[in-house]
Amino acid sequence: MAEKCSAVFMDRDGTINEEVSFLNRMEQLKLYPQSGEAIRLINAAGMKAVVVSNQSGIARGYFTEDFVRSVHDRINELLGAEGARIDGFYVCPHHPIHGQGIYKQDCDCRKPKPGMLLQAAREMNIDLARSYMVGDMLRDVQTGKNAGAKGILVKTGYGVNVIRTDMPAYIAGDILEAVQWILKDRKKE
């Protein structure tokens, strides 16, 4: 079996693109200016770039899974213009309280549970102990910890207002600073 690779798991909204409450129109999608460079660095380092995102708007009926896939296609199109790519997108469409139909469930994939990272690790041959989870909420950091990866908080999106700082391995101003720290941290291995 091939050697396992490491990955940078990233939250989507508020981490690589601007936070809007329930992105449900394509024109709302705006990548942060530093996202392309950050993800290009991940790609160049031979790490997998993986988005893991709670999308309870699906459960709530605000948009469809097909719409979310089209957003992810557009993200890779925008990143591709900058020489970068996301290797995998994993989405939790559920909500335990506000979900409708099959989407109303207490699942294993909704962050801070590690289900999306565990699934990606299986499907993409990722070594979670050598991987990182970057996000703008403490639940993103906790998701990384729950999967055995290092959690990094970015001070964009909801992260701007986070005061508690005892959980992350690092607190970065944005995704680019987070990736620069990751690349330095990997050299310690």
Task: Set out the residue ranges of the language-model regions.
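Asp-based, Mg2+/Mn2+-dependent phosphohydrolase catalytic module
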Residues: 2-4, 66-69, 73-88, 96-133, ...
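Active-site neighborhood of HAD-like aspartate-dependent phosphohydrolases
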Residues: 2-50
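Active-site flanking residues adjacent to catalytic metal/cofactor-binding acidic residues
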Residues: 10-12, 53, 135-136, 173
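Catalytic P-loop NTPase motifs of RecA-like helicase/translocase cores
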Residues: 16-17, 59, 140-141
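Short glycine-enriched, charge-decorated loop/helix-capping segments at active-site entrances
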Residues: 21-30, 64-66, 103-107
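A short, flexible beta-alpha/helix-coil linker loop
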Residues: 21-23, 56-59, 96-97, 160
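Short beta-strand segments at enzyme active-site cores
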Residues: 48-54, 87-92, 153-154
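A short secondary-structure junction motif
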Residues: 55-68
